[in-house]
Amino acid sequence: MLKYKRILLKLSGEALAGNKEFGFSNEVLESFAKQIKDVHEKGVEIAIVIGGGNIFRGISGMEKGFDRVTGDTMGMLATIMNGLALQNTIENLGVPTRVMTALQMPQVAELYIRRKAIRHLEKGRVVIFAGGTSNPYFTTDSSGALRAVEIQADVLAKGTKVDGIYDKDPMKFDDAVRYDTVTFDEAISKNLGVMDTAALSLCRENEMPIVVFNALEEGNILKMAQGNNIGTTIKKK
């Protein structure tokens, strides 16, 4: 039984690198693609926002001497590369997929138009949103929140390397406790670090629930779509 009919799946670029520091892991790409196909075959409309951290992070570019706007623009271009890689892998499994970018690049991908994106979903296509918001100073989490609200998704599902939100770093503390649910206010006031404040605030204002879960574990995207308790849900109350 499916809990969500339309999902915005936010994937980190770093996850695509697998155990490498840079680039793509074919194993991770294929795992994500297979999971997305399984969810798609159940009749779920699925849109994806993917980060670019496996190629370039705008904020870290400042350490290399780039100004923030240039660095963020390079990061947005990295998300397009990731989007194309994921599109190719999903389509190899026979699932029709469209990449839509907020940056004009007509030879490479469709320009993002909200109504057209919704139409693609209604026609049974997976849609990958790339190019961030096209504006610097906004993270791909903010882009994910924005697109989730725009396409009227039922949930913003943030796929990470950990199985939810903890009261402290589970990698460092054995006694870390996972939250089943937290409110938006708690996530912001406690600075839990799951998303930036802009993304959380946008979801709070539009009552867009967020589920944080481990997307690297095979089958978890479908379990999330079915409403299984495999992560942490952030909601208004």
What are these regions (language model features)?
Residues 1-237:
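C-terminal catalytic "cap/lid" subdomain
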